[in-house]
Every structure is written in structure tokens, then in C-alpha cells.
A protein has these predicted regions:
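Conserved class I S-adenosyl-L-methionine
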Residues: 22-31
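A conserved beta-strand element that flanks and buttresses the S-adenosyl-L-methionine
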Residues: 82
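C-terminal alpha-helical "lid/dimerization" subdomain adjacent to the S-adenosyl-L-methionine
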Residues: 35-37, 41, 113-175
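Conserved beta-strand signature within the Rossmann-like core of class I S-adenosyl-L-methionine
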Residues: 106-114
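Short catalytic micro-motifs in class I SAM-dependent methyltransferases
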Residues: 85-86
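A short, conserved alpha-helix within the catalytic core of class I
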Residues: 90-100
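Class I SAM-dependent methyltransferase SAM/SAH-binding core
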Residues: 31-70
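Class I SAM-dependent methyltransferase Rossmann-like catalytic core
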Residues: 1-12
Length: 190
């Protein structure tokens, strides 16, 4: 497995421990299912449902398809909803974030990106293309500018438990450009 994903999971465990163990979790944008398998395998979640807009042949867990807009879950039906490096791939990240808020009963966990300058956005777009093109994952470049997603969560009745940025996920020399653009955040329904 990629050292990047391993570092992401280690950072999430280090900074978001109050959300674990969860009885039920939703892995939104599950990709190959690695995070879902690790969440269960490490005892961070008892049961994980994995959703994705396109299936991958190499999936490690059962992944269900969804339309990329409406999550096929009832309101407040899972204890933890998470998306790792997913929202910026969505056509409408705020609408998907609203769906995540609707479906969680307790915690919402994000690992994604934020940018301030044109150079930051260009850096994210370049890394996104390099990292995702081989999987056929579109990169619409819908990155969070500043903290708009955070504002949406907190206006939607969620209390910030932790927000970490920058996050040391990429080694030298890429980390000089990439780490300042990374964030991990955990919110709890009020």
C-alpha cells in the first residue's frame, strides 16, 4: 500500500481519536476500499459501508455505487461519515458535504485540501492529475479555498473537535509544496 495512505491513516488516528471506535461508519469515495478495510481491521469502526461513483476491480472490500450527489442512506443513520481526499473530486462539494451532514448521527471526518494562492491551486491540480489519472478519476479542481467547507459544517450544527493544517503527509521534497495544502478535521453533531 502507498506510504501516503499509511501516513494519512496514522495522522487521522493521532488527531481524531475521540471518534473511534465507531459502531457504524460510511466511507464516502472509497476507491479501492483500503481505508474501509483498515478502519475495520484496526478496530476503528465495527462496520463500514463503502460508497463510490465508479467501481474498481482491485477493491479490498465490497463497494456500492451511488450517483455522486445523493447518499443512499437515511438521515442520521451512521455514527461516523468520512471522506479522505474525496470532496474536491465532486461536481458540487458543498452539496455532498450537506449529504454527509444529513447521514451522520455523530461525527464527520474529512481529510482534504485547502489553498490560498494560484500557485497553491496549480500545485494541487498537478498532484491530483498525477495521482488520479491512472485510475480514471476525474479532477474537476473543486478545491476548498480558505475554509469555506469548515464554515458550512459549523453553520450546519457541527462543532469542531479538531482541525489540523498543515499535515505532514508527503516526504521531502514534495512535502515542501504539498503539506501546507493538507488538512484533517473532525466535527461532532451538536
Amino acid at each position: 500500500m502507498s506510504s501516503y495512505k499509511t501516513r494519512v491513516l496514522a495522522a487521522i488516528e493521532a488527531h481524531c481519536g475521540e471518534a473511534f471506535p465507531a459502531d457504524t461508519a460510511l466511507d464516502l469515495g472509497a476507491g479501492d476500499g483500503w481505508y474501509a478495510s483498515q478502519m475495520q481491521g484496526r478496530g476503528l469502526a465495527e462496520s463500514v459501508q463503502a460508497l463510490e461513483v465508479q467501481l474498481r476491480r482491485d477493491a479490498l472490500v465490497e463497494v456500492a455505487l451511488y450517483d455522486g450527489r445523493h447518499l443512499p442512506l437515511a438521515d442520521r443513520s451512521v455514527e461516523l461519515v468520512y471522506a479522505f481526499d474525496v470532496l474536491h473530486h465532486c461536481v458540487d462539494p458543498l452539496a455532498v458535504l450537506d449529504e454527509m451532514m444529513r447521514c451522520t448521527d455523530r461525527y464527520l471526518l474529512l481529510k482534504d485540501h485547502t489553498f490560498k494562492s494560484r500557485l497553491d491551486r496549480w500545485t494541487l491540480a498537478t498532484f491530483d492529475e498525477i495521482g488520479n489519472r491512472r485510475f480514471g478519476v476525474p479532477s474537476p479542481r473543486n478545491y476548498q479555498r480558505g475554509w469555506g467547507w469548515v464554515d458550512r459544517l459549523e453553520a450546519g450544527g457541527f462543532e469542531r473537535c479538531t482541525l489540523v493544517s498543515p499535515v505532514e503527509l508527503a516526504g521531502f521534497p514534495l512535502g515542501l509544496l504539498a503539506n501546507k495544502l493538507q488538512f484533517i478535521g473532525l466535527w461532532r453533531r451538536q
